[in-house]
């Protein structure tokens, strides 16, 4: 009986861990308050700053499977904990 109970506890813990989803900020503004639950396979939050023209900046935040690449003059920061891309 104890073995069965222990087995059920272990299976429950493993199943709960598999269902974890990351939460990241997701908006195109500098000051952001909108959160997104990442899809399965997206384990990275990112914050990207793109400079398109002099004095023209674009902010992008969201979820990704891998850290996004950048172009010259762009900056990106990646992290893997909830709401870490502030």
UniProtKB/Swiss-Prot annotation:
SUPFAM superfamilies: Snake toxin-like. Transmembrane segments: none annotated. It is found in: Secreted. One of its GO terms (cellular component) is extracellular region. Its main location: secreted. Binds with low affinity to muscular (alpha-1-beta-1-delta-epsilon/CHRNA1-CHRNB1-CHRND-CHRNE) and very low affinity to neuronal (alpha-7/CHRNA7) nicotinic acetylcholine receptor (nAChR). This is Weak neurotoxin 9.
